[in-house]
Amino acid sequence: MTGQSRIAGLAFAATLLSAYPPSRLTAQDPWPVLDHASQTYQTIANLSADFVQVVANPMIGAPDTTRGRLYQMRPSRFAMRFTDPKGDRIVADGRYLWLYTPSTTPGQVIRSRIPEVGTTGPNLIGQFVERPRERYTARYVRSDSLADGVADIVTLKPKTGDQPYSAATIWIRRDDGLVQRMEIAETSGQDRTVVLTNLKVNAGVPGREFTFSPPAGVRVVDQ
């Protein structure tokens, strides 16, 4: 962008701002949106959804895109069964979190114990909508049109520094309060985007999705 075009762009933006009265520029309160999402989450015993996950890391080149089906059962069971790359799994069985990714690290599975208290557990959605007023500062971004309705977009920043991310922007469906998209800025430098479709709430989840038995010959690495 040249200096002249940059100045022209700033002048145009200033003209737009001056055309609206201050009341039109007042930031919308994000908390009613988050309260709606939190209330909805409390009614969910189990959930499943198709997911597309994109992880971008400028240090390693092109973004990595994966797909599959996500499962959740409160309070501490969570799973991601990947169809691309096929065979990869993430399983939280209530006691352990299993990370099995033969597509990148064949011959091993990483196992870590789930803390019994003090966290939401390995819960992709719940970490953002359980007690959000206690855990985050929030800013309303804008509304967005979805294929099946409208979503409100809110950016969250953790109040404490012990989270593995510095910010998360979430899309909350206006009609039912379900989270449909998450863009997470991780402290590792990665940006992770997860988009959920075909959400099914309280329709039951097969118990096998929350169990993991290491295949023969696979080494268990405890962390």
What does each of the following model-derived ranges do?
Residues 108-110, 124, 133-223:
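Gly/Pro-enriched, hydrophobic low-complexity segments
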Residues 44-46, 65-67, 73-75, 85, ...:
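Extracytoplasmic
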Residues 51, 78-81, 97-100, 156, ...:
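Short hydrophobic/aromatic-rich beta-strand segments that constitute the beta-sheet cores
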Residues 9-19:
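Bacterial N-terminal signal peptides
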Residues 13, 23-63, 77, 214-223:
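N-terminal leader/targeting segments and the immediate start of mature chains
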Residues 69-121, 192-195:
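An acidic-aromatic
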